[in-house]
Amino acid sequence: MVQKVKTFLSKGNRAAWCLFLLFAISIFLKGVIFHWFCFHSVILSSLWHHPLEFIRFWGGKLIPALFLGGFVFLFRSKTWMIYAHVLIDIWLIANLFYYNANALFLSYETMKMADNMSGFWDSLYAYTEWSMLLYPIITLLFAVCLLCIPKVSKRLPIAFCVVMSLSLLLSIIDNLCFKVYTHSWHPQNKVTEQVNSRMLSGEEFTYYYPFGHVYYFAVVSKSIDYNAWAYSYVREYSVLSYFPACFVWSILRPAGEIIDLTEKDIEQVRPFIHGNIRQKTPTPQTNLVFVLFESLESWPIDEVCGYNFMPNLQAILRNKHSLYCNKLKSQVRHGNSADGQLIDITGLLPIANGATCRLYADNILPSYAQCYPYSAIINPAPGMWNQEKVTFGYQFKQLIEPQKGEHWADKELIDQMINYIDTVKEPFCLFGISVSSHVPFSQGSINPTYIIDGMPHIMLAYLNCLHYTDSVIGNLVNAVQCNERLANNTTIVISGDHTIFRGEDQEIDTFADIHDINMQTTHTYTPLIIYSPKKIKNNIYVTDTCYQMDIYPTIMDIIGCEEYFWKGVGVNVMDSAARNNRPILEKDAYDISDMIIRSNYFNLH
């Protein structure tokens, strides 16, 4: 049978055309499968409802398959196609991992941060899913099919030109259909409003050529940030064409450069600057101890299936000198934990593309640490998130961390924090970074304290990790409360760096629903817990939805530094009027923060 197929294909140019079809179809199939698992739709019914949408959608998936398939006519060897498939698999699987973890797609800047995974590669296990196996399976089947196809006898440059011209024509048609379709059926779409805000002419005519979509949003319109553009591009076109597109974006709108603000931009920033930025900083009225709790969400603080996983945090909440906000919306971007640190320390939100800690680590930013004569960050994982630079960019005086190549578990972290507060002079500011509850929650898998029948493994491991960290945080709280020098003069803040269950995990959601657990993986919050005997005299329980950007202004009020020139873009959560009457929307807070960081505003103005 195989020999008959080879004989048939050996005549004329049949082998080349068969290879082209096989290669192009396999690439096309991978792109469609990726789209399905990310967006859960393939828009088939639109063929008779909205034909332009159908052409736009499938055309975007077909273009990269045609483009790559065309090179079959230039190379006689078949080996390169296997390499191409393997590289495509790596790109697709890497994006699936990143999307499952962050609901974002890889960018050029995030690819440059791969070294940050050092010591945390096992976290990928938590985001592995069976669909990832489909891509290497298709590659394997393609390799088997190659055995049935004879070697191409000659190059076909004319066929190559025809296929390239077809892909270019399809690109123009697809872009045109995208514009016409969105204008006709989705005028309420924010991206569409910007696309159709003015007629395309002159330089904007490039919109109709490959990567014109990138050019328009990166250069002409600048109406949306990178993440919104990337999501739109992958959904409307293909994750395969997104690979070169993300590099094109980085060329058209490079990240990491210091930008110049227009007078209009400066007017937007000025309302958030109070007084002279060079003025003398106020003296804090209390010491400050902040624990950035890795991946802490709010729901585990309550009882789960009759078990109390976090008794020490609950004990803090029962104390009359505590504040608890249980609905704090995570606002991190590509920087993940580093973004959480940025928000909590400086009151600024992260930049749109890339991680602030990498691209703008040399910027000196305002923070409550500037107000303290003694301050330190304790980092349990050296080299993580460029901590050796941003610690001093956030105006802390000292960085404490283990030797390179070593990591501290949370018990060792808390021991270091206790040692610091026992020996440092006052007033002091200490910021500790927890890591033991990092995915894949191995701390809770190796030696679980609780075993609950039927609970999904990852959920149980997560809860046991939190229980471990809660137990050592109890040691820190006791160390403060039992120290006469610190007991009434120290504020303790505990909050999560970000939420962790961000995808649609049906198994976890079903278990939570059956057992009346107040959580959904698509709608989770991180908590804010503050213990301050000097400032808080009666329990404060905030049930309104708040934001991570509210942590900084709340702390500034509690430590008595309200007169500091920078109060952040959030509000004090203890002020109910401010919570319900915010000066700006979340989107505007992102934009203002982006301008401040990327212009190095506090050094230049």
Short names for language-model regions:
Residues 4-242:
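Transmembrane and membrane-interface helices of multi-pass
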Residues 49-50, 149-150, 202, 237, ...:
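Short, flexible coil/linker elements and helix-boundary hinge sites characteristic
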Residues 195-290, 297-315, 604:
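Membrane/wall-proximal cationic-aromatic binding patches
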